[in-house]
Amino acid sequence: MVVKRTQTDSRMQSTPGNHNHPDAHANAAYMTPPSMGALNANNSNSQLSTLTISPMTYLANNTSTDGSFLKERNAQNTDSLSREDYLRLWRHDALMQQQYKCAAFVGEKVLDITGNPNDAFWLAQVYCCTGDYARAKCLLTKEDLYNRSSACRYLAAFCLVKLYDWQGALNLLGETNPFRKDEKNANKLLMQDGGIKLEASMCYLRGQVYTNLSNFDRAKECYKEALMVDAKCYEAFDQLVSNHLLTADEEWDLVLKLNYSTYSKEDAAFLRSLYMLKLNKTSHEDELRRAEDYLSSINGLEKSSDLLLCKADTLFVRSRFIDVLAITTKILEIDPYNLDVYPLHLASLHESGEKNKLYLISNDLVDRHPEKAVTWLAVGIYYLCVNKISEARRYFSKSSTMDPQFGPAWIGFAHSFAIEGEHDQAISAYTTAARLFQGTHLPYLFLGMQHMQLGNILLANEYLQSSYALFQYDPLLLNELGVVAFNKSDMQTAINHFQNALLLVKKTQSNEKPWAATWANLGHAYRKLKMYDAAIDALNQGLLLSTNDANVHTAIALVYLHKKIPGLAITHLHESLAISPNEIMASDLLKRALEENSLTSGFLNSKYVFEDEVSEYMQQSNLNTSDKSMSMEDQSGKVTESVNDRTQVLYADSRSEMMMDDIEGNVSEQR
């Protein structure tokens, strides 16, 4: 089809009758889009949106001088419509009713008649709806259409992205935004027609190109620029938040600094609050609570899935997994195809040990959405839950291959290596995650934990410090920093980290039981400073949270031995051996405690009494410790969603074991 440049009728050359109407200039652009050279920022229609070039918008805004609508808006009266407008409405309605052959048939005719770039844009939209991106690109790049219309340029670049021609798309869009040379003038045009500015959409598309070229720094800047150009460009905001390209503080700063000046006070508060729902749930709790309350007060929004999901996120951070499941289940009952809910829902099921539900959900997702990355994440989490690690790894890998930007899949893949002690592969996978998701602290945290397992304390400290620089509100991170300080014999720093971790747990977690190991770590640090009373208090706190922890009983016994109170030490060592009869350290300490006790209370009498007590306790070897899980704070998003809490338990519990030393003060790791 050859695009003809024919003269349109006088009706197509006009503007709305009321020239003071705020969309008058925009509607003029619909009629006669400005001719522009290649990305000429001084002569562009990039400040407009596709609303401007919609035939429905034009007819709706084309009013008479007294403000009454023209009779052309009456669908039953089309006598006064020109042939071109009649064809445009026909094409548009066919497109809205998914009658794409009809829309293409009519669209080709109106383009032949008018040669208007806007008609070319809508015909190309029809081709895009059928997945024929090559044909759409061919149409938009002939006759220099993309140089005459920003809408055509944007859509041509979009087609090239869909065709994986990254360099071609970048050539059309430009490596940087050419329209931002005069920011003051640009800001005046933000709300010209109420839609999303094409300039913002092109910035977003430029970010997509850089993302696929693995240039994440440039991609991040493009997404941020898209939002600064037009705060309504939600796609750019979602890329920044869901892919963790910004730190938690950077996310909040961006939302607060967006240009809301062109909105009313109420609309600005509404949009800002909507965006806040997507941000990190640990920092800025007061602002988040106010945003939730404001949106909940709006009639109908209390049922919004985004608002409910925000509440579920907050509960997940507080380890209230049953409450999380109640909310996510409610959302899925309303909309079972809301895939954004599944990462959090699956993580909570894993935390709760719901193997059967994970199995059913995984099968359902495989049947309904085999092409989605979250489907294979669900399968991987199920296999992780039943301890089939190799199968879990395979499906995590499949999920990350289908969507390379899907954070939970990458972290689950890395965790599967960590569980089996394959540290090199785990480090490689975590490093990839750190490169992809630059704004989240979790990959650096896991890298530090891996190097600590390998005994590389200096490297572990570097990664943990990098993690802390990104996010300071994760108690697990603070615990690990304390362990590093302990291993460097910096006991006061270790105590500070452990105390800060426990304060944060008290503030943000409803379930403190998983953090018994941190109390034990604090007790060990106090013991090393010979602050024995403080050590016993901390260890007893850990014992209250985890009554069946043999390590804590052994640690308390060790402190009592230091205090020369062998009788109480023996009592706790009996408890330890009753829980874990094969505990070598407890057995050795018991022998020493018995020897020391015999010197003060009579060797012969005490010897047989204590030996009888040990025998009695060792008969209780069938006692089982409770299965503990330590969930992590959820970052913007759902990078880990605690897909592998077993790894975290291994590290957390090993902290107490690693920090146990014998009575002379030498550290003896018990793994």
Curated annotation (Swiss-Prot):
Phosphorylated. InterPro entries: TPR-like_helical_dom_sf, TPR_rpt. It holds the Pfam family TPR_12. GO terms for biological process: anaphase-promoting complex-dependent catabolic process; cell division; positive regulation of mitotic metaphase/anaphase transition; positive regulation of mitotic sister chromatid separation; protein ubiquitination. TPR repeats lie at residues 83-114, 117-142, 150-173, 198-229, 234-257, 268-296, 306-334, 341-368, 373-402, 407-435, 442-470, 475-507, 513-545, 550-579. Gene3D superfamilies: Tetratricopeptide repeat domain. Residues 1-24, 622-643 are annotated as: Disordered. The APC/C is composed of at least 13 subunits: apc1, apc2, nuc2, apc4, apc5, cut9, apc8, apc10, apc11, hcn1, apc13, apc14 and apc15. Homodimer. Interacts directly with nuc2 and hcn1. Component of the anaphase-promoting complex/cyclosome (APC/C), a cell cycle-regulated E3 ubiquitin-protein ligase complex that controls progression through mitosis and the G1 phase of the cell cycle. The APC/C is thought to confer substrate specificity and, in the presence of ubiquitin-conjugating E2 enzymes, it catalyzes the formation of protein-ubiquitin conjugates that are subsequently degraded by the 26S proteasome. May play a pivotal role in the control of anaphase. The keyword Thylakoid does not apply. TPR repeats 1-7 mediate homodimerization while TPR repeats 8 and 10-13 bind to hcn1, burying its N-terminal acetyl-methionine. It comes from Schizosaccharomyces pombe (strain 972 / ATCC 24843) (Fission yeast). It is found in: Nucleus. It comes from the Eukaryota. One of its GO terms (cellular component) is anaphase-promoting complex. Changing A535T: In cut9-665; temperature-sensitive. Keywords: Cell cycle, Cell division, Mitosis, Nucleus, Phosphoprotein, Repeat, TPR repeat, Ubl conjugation pathway. This is Anaphase-promoting complex subunit cut9. The lineage of its organism: Eukaryota, Fungi, Dikarya, Ascomycota, Taphrinomycotina.
